[in-house]
Structures are given as C-alpha cells and as structure tokens.
C-alpha cells in the first residue's frame, strides 16, 4: 500500500499553507533584524569586511523572503559545503515526483522539504558572507529562553538532586514512577519551541513538576509503561548481573527543553536503567531553537557557573558524565537534511548502524515526528510502526507536543472528536504523545 500524500502548502488554509505564507517570512524578518542589529559587532570583530558581509547577508535574506512570498522555484545550493550535493540531488528527486513542466516551489512542494530548505538557505546566506559565516542568527533567542526559564530550571535541578540522594531507597515501582514523571517533564518541556512562536519569548517560567497531574489527560498516546518495560528488562537472569544498556536521545530545542533531556539522561544512569546515553544534535543552526554543539556545551558551562548550588552541581556532574564517556555527544549532517527517516539507511548508513546499537532511541519534538512519519496525511488510527514504513533501527519512542497536523496511533474516534471540539488541537502544543515502536 502506498503511503498517503505529503502535507503541503498547496492545500490552501492548511497549517502547512499558513506556515509558508506567514510564519517563515516572519522568521526571516527576525533573522534580518538580528543580523542588522549586530552590525557594530561585525565591524568590531572584522572591520569594514564585517560590514560588507552584513550587507551581503541582508540582501540574500531579503531575496529569500521574497522567493517564499511569491512562490518562486526552489533553487540549487551554491555554497560548496559537505551537504550541498545531497541537497541538490534531493531537489532533482523532488522534480521526478512532479508532472512534466512543473518545478518544485515553496507552495507546491512538500512542506517538510521547503521548511528544512529555508533553514539550509539561511546557512547558505551566511556561508557566502565571510567573515560572518559562523554566526548563529538564532543564538540570542536560545540564550534568552535559557535565562528566562531560570525558576523552572532551578526546580528541576533541585528535584534531580533529591532523587539521586534517595535513589538507593526506591522500590522498582517507585523507580517506574520517577521515570514516568521525567518522561512527562521531557514531553511538556517540548512546548518551548521558538520556531512555532516565530522566535518570540516562549520560555518556561514555572515548574512543570507541579502541573504533571493536570496535564495527564492531554497525553493522547501514553506508552510510558512500555518504555519502562524496555529499559528495566536489563538483568541477565542467569547471573543476576545488569547488562550494559544504551539509550540515544535525538535532541530538539535548546534552552529549558535541553535541561529536561539532561535531567532524564542523568536519572537514567542513577536509576540504572541505562549505562550510557548518546545525544544527537544538529551541526548547524536549525528551526530557530534546535540544539547545536555550541548550545550543548554552553548550557552545561552556564549551569556549572550558576550561583545556585543544585544548578551548579548538575553542571559539574554533567561535565563529568561527558568526560567519563557515559554521556556521548554526536552530530551528523543527516539531521539537517530534508529526508524523511525511512531514507536514513540509504542516505546515511553510518548513522543508521549507529542507532542500531541502541536499546532505545528517544526522538524529541515535532520535526523528528514529522520525519519519522514522512509528514504525510495519515489516518489518525494508522499504527505508529506502519507510519515509520522502513525505519526500524531499534526500539524507538517519540516524545512530542503536537505542533503540526500529523498524528498516528490514536484509538478510533479520538482524532475526529478532537477535530470537531478543538479545530487547532494538532498545532496548539496543548496535546502530547509518548509513543513507542518496538518493531526492529
């Protein structure tokens, strides 16, 4: 059976259409503003060359914004980076899906493709504007979100330290409850997505922990029991010894959400549900608030230097986890390609075989869910493993709040009822899933 058609702005009035029409130009306007405001910094760092680069980048971004708004054809990349050829091959592939004489364009091509392409074009605009090529146009928003989420970060770091101090006294059932709590914290931390708010303040200002019970009815797929079963089945029955267990987390947003991922990763080690945690981040600024290597290291460094004892204790511990290699950082170009994940084995076989070593791969956030399911018009009741088509490297769990109109694995009638009661239920971030597939 062929999978359904891709979500696309050609469906007028759809969320994809509104994203391309309104949100992407709005994000580019913010990028233009950020680059312009940093003109003096570019001058201080690079003299006149920096000012010229700023002008060149601004011109590039203004032209890009116009291309989107007027539904121009998608252009090949020209920046000779290590992924340029892959992007241009993907453009050729998109052409093969169209009728003769048609060309891929912003409002006619798959939404997943053109939205990813916009962020890669932003990167191209900087690469072609040396010496400001390394500048992260989204960094200001990410650091601001981190600082504005301080009360929630303090509450979470404090909770983690109390859990670790008490871990020896916990029964198996209590450990299961703690895992469930921290999975929920990871889920609702995923609300802090700057690409959805167009880069406006979207920080976490209160402690999520106190709200978990009231949020429970909004979890549409709750596979937390099964996640516990996957992680806790780690004893060798003959010897009673614990087996090595690897968990991978494919990261989403920097800021508060990244802290929730770190807290979960630390707790997995303390609860002896994992012996090593591998983090996968983006190798370039992406979707406004996605985590890069700089964000990853910056966050740990800022926690270490915090004047709150449990925040700084977390920072110190997490740095040690990296030094001891029980936390391992990865980045791969594939995460910033437009390909859906069922193409990973073919396009990035090295990454696919890396994920195959995992006992559980956790995919954070909406973009990962869209790529897992191919960002298609699936029926709500289609089983998750079926929507993954050929992508089954290891048991995998998606943790996302809904901010795009794709959702599978619901019980019959649930999607329809929500659609009639709350037309924006799939895009508001109010609902979430912790959705597991154990197909391998």
Swiss-Prot record:
GO biological process, one term: DNA damage response
Catalytic activity annotation: beta-D-fructose 1-phosphate + H2O = D-fructose + phosphate; beta-D-fructose 6-phosphate = dihydroxyacetone + D-glyceraldehyde 3-phosphate; L-glutamyl-[protein] + S-adenosyl-L-methionine = [protein]-L-glutamate 5-O-methyl ester + S-adenosyl-L-homocysteine
Cofactor(s) for this UniProt protein: Mn(2+); Ni(2+)
Keywords: Hydrolase, Manganese, Metal-binding, Methyltransferase, Nickel, S-adenosyl-L-methionine, Transferase
Gene3D superfamilies hit by this protein: 1.20.930.60, Uncharacterised protein PF01937, DUF89, domain 3
SUPFAM superfamilies cross-referenced by the UniProt entry: AF1104-like
Positions annotated to bind Mn(2+): 252-253, 290
Binding-site positions, S-adenosyl-L-methionine: 257, 290
Domain of life: Eukaryota
Pfam family, one: ARMT1-like_dom
E.C. numbers: 3.1.3.-, 2.1.1.-
PANTHER family documented for this protein: DAMAGE-CONTROL PHOSPHATASE ARMT1 (PTHR12260:SF6)
Domain notes: Subfamily III proteins have a conserved RTxK motif about 40-50 residues from the C-terminus; the threonine may be replaced by serine or cysteine.
Known function: Metal-dependent phosphatase that shows phosphatase activity against several substrates, including fructose-1-phosphate and fructose-6-phosphate. Its preference for fructose-1-phosphate, a strong glycating agent that causes DNA damage rather than a canonical yeast metabolite, suggests a damage-control function in hexose phosphate metabolism. Has also been shown to have O-methyltransferase activity that methylates glutamate residues of target proteins to form gamma-glutamyl methyl ester residues. Possibly methylates PCNA, suggesting it is involved in the DNA damage response.
Protein family according to the UniProt entry: Belongs to the damage-control phosphatase family. Sugar phosphate phosphatase III subfamily.
Stated name of the protein: Damage-control phosphatase ARMT1
Source organism of the structure: Xenopus tropicalis (Western clawed frog)
Lineage of the species this protein comes from: Eukaryota, Metazoa, Chordata, Craniata, Vertebrata
């Amino acid at each position: 059976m062929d999978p359904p058609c891709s979500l696309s702005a050609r469906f007028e009035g759809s969320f994809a259409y509104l994203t391309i029409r309104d949100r992407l130009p709005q994000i580019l306007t913010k990028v233009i503003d950020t680059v312009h405001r940093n003109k003096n910094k570019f001058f201080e760092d690079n003299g006149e060359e920096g000012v010229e680069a700023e002008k060149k980048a601004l011109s590039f971004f203004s032209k890009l914004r116009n291309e989107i708004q007027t539904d121009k054809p998608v252009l090949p990349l020209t920046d000779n980076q290590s992924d340029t050829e892959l992007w241009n091959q993907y453009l050729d592939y998109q052409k093969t899906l169209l009728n003769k004489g048609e060309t891929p364009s912003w409002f006619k091509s798959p939404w997943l493709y053109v939205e990813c392409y916009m962020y890669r074009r932003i990167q191209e605009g900087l690469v072609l504007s040396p010496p400001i090529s390394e500048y992260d146009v989204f960094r200001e928003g990410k650091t601001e979100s981190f600082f504005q989420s301080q009360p929630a970060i303090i509450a979470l770091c404090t909770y983690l330290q109390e859990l670790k101090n008490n871990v020896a006294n916990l029964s198996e059932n209590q450990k299961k409850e703690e895992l469930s709590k921290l999975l929920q914290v990871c889920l609702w931390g995923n609300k802090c997505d700057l690409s959805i708010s167009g880069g406006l303040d979207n920080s976490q200002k209160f402690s999520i922990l106190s709200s978990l019970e009231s949020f429970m009815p909004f979890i549409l797929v709750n596979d937390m029991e099964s996640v516990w079963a996957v992680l806790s089945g780690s004893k060798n029955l003959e010897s009673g010894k614990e087996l090595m267990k690897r968990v991978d987390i494919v990261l989403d947003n920097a800021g508060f959400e990244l802290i929730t991922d770190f807290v979960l990763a630390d707790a997995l080690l303390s609860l002896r549900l994992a012996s090593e945690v591998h983090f996968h981040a983006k190798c370039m600024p992406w979707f406004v608030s996605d985590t890069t290597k700089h964000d990853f290291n910056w966050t740990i460094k800022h926690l270490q230097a915090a004047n709150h004892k449990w925040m700084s204790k977390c920072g110190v511990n997490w740095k040690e986890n990296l030094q001891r290699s029980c936390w391992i950082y990865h980045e791969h170009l594939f995460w910033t390609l437009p390909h859906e994940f069922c193409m990973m084995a073919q396009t990035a076989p090295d990454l696919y075989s890396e994920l195959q070593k995992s006992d559980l791969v956790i995919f954070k956030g909406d973009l990962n869910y869209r790529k897992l399911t191919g960002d298609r018009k699936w029926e709500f009741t289609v089983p998750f493993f079926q929507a993954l088509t050929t992508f089954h490297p290891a048991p995998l769990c998606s943790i996302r709040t809904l901010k795009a109109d794709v959702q599978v694995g619901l019980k019959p009638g649930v999607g329809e009822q929500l659609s009639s009661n709350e037309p924006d239920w799939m895009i508001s971030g109010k609902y979430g899933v912790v959705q597991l597939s154990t197909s391998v």
